[in-house]
């Protein structure tokens, strides 16, 4: 069903979205969602496969293009993007977007061999271990200057080390809530700091909310063309108390 003022969709359209944190979540069969943060579901994916995409994809897309200012469609970009926690949900989408839509050199961090292999399989040019000195590893790669950083997890543990090898006047983006974060670490190099929160537009009803509708449609098109792929790991089937309990336990692990 659609409301009387809806113009982007009609009854029966298959859609995907991340919703809003200002109302109850999605542990239910029916949802009420603003059309401006809703996209047309990729035709080549099941609903479960599509449902795994909006939260991480909107975050990755906004972080890369809106916050860090990467240029889509630019075939050559003489800079390196470093993604910490590249094997996670956001990182897995971010690697794909950066490799397929920009000319950036993409380096990711991961510790386990299987996580490192996953990052490379998604398209990362190189992977380093964030539990080892990163500056030496970056220098050994001989990649272009690290001008853009997407810090996705444990920012408080790594940002000072990253600031040491970032290029002057670079951009440092993050999505987590570090308990300790000192901006002065970036002052000497005039590095700007950018937080990304994909619920900002819906929470504050920003004038550009429609951007999320557009990027979800662009994502669906890229999925259907085989440029991007879903990162769904597993599905539990029908919505019921037992399955929700299992799913939440997995998320919390």
Predicted regions and their residues:
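Short, flexible surface segments
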Residues: 8-11, 77, 168
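A glycine-/small-residue-rich N-terminal strand-loop-strand element
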Residues: 1-20
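Mid-domain Rossmann-like dinucleotide-binding core that forms the NAD(H)/NADP(H) cofactor-binding site
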Residues: 51-132
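Glycine-rich cofactor phosphate-binding loops and adjacent beta1-alpha1 units
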Residues: 72-75, 122, 127-196
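C-terminal hydrophobic helical "lid"/dimerization subdomain
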Residues: 206-253
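A structural motif shared across PLP-dependent enzymes of the aminotransferase-like
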Residues: 22-35
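Hydrophobic beta-strand signal
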Residues: 16-17, 32, 82, 173
